[in-house]
């Protein structure tokens, strides 16, 4: 799948789960499971409950996503 097919949405971290998984509440009210992208993992960026993040989602699975950016 091309990168242009991904949906980028903003959300807030609700809960930190094991194995670098997070529950994220999106702006539209939906709650999804998201994991951390490799760049965030490589740079040791901490993600805590309450943080605002940008999540990339596939149009084929709207229940899961990848966290690509954490707002300060």
Swiss-Prot record:
Entry GO MF terms: ribosome binding; rRNA binding; translation initiation factor activity
UniProt keyword annotation of Protein biosynthesis present: yes
Listed GO CC annotations: cytosol
Domain S1-like positions: 1-72
Main location group: cytoplasm
InterPro entries in the cross-refs: NA-bd_OB-fold, RNA-binding_domain_S1_IF1, S1_domain, TIF_IF1
Protein location: Cytoplasm
Record note on quaternary structure: Component of the 30S ribosomal translation pre-initiation complex which assembles on the 30S ribosome in the order IF-2 and IF-3, IF-1 and N-formylmethionyl-tRNA(fMet); mRNA recruitment can occur at any time during PIC assembly.
Protein family (similarity comment): Belongs to the IF-1 family.
Function: One of the essential components for the initiation of protein synthesis. Stabilizes the binding of IF-2 and IF-3 on the 30S subunit to which N-formylmethionyl-tRNA(fMet) subsequently binds. Helps modulate mRNA selection, yielding the 30S pre-initiation complex (PIC). Upon addition of the 50S ribosomal subunit IF-1, IF-2 and IF-3 are released leaving the mature 70S translation initiation complex.
Protein name: Translation initiation factor IF-1
Protein species of origin: Spiroplasma kunkelii
Lineage: Bacteria, Bacillati, Mycoplasmatota, Mollicutes, Entomoplasmatales
Record gene name: infA
């Amino acid at each position: 799948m091309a990168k242009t097919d991904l949906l980028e949405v903003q959300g807030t971290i609700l809960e930190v789960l094991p194995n670098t998984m997070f529950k994220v509440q999106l702006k539209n009210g939906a709650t999804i499971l998201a994991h951390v992208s490799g760049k965030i993992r490589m740079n040791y960026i901490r993600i805590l409950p309450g943080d605002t993040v940008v999540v990339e989602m596939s149009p084929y699975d709207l229940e899961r996503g990848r966290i690509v950016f954490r707002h300060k």
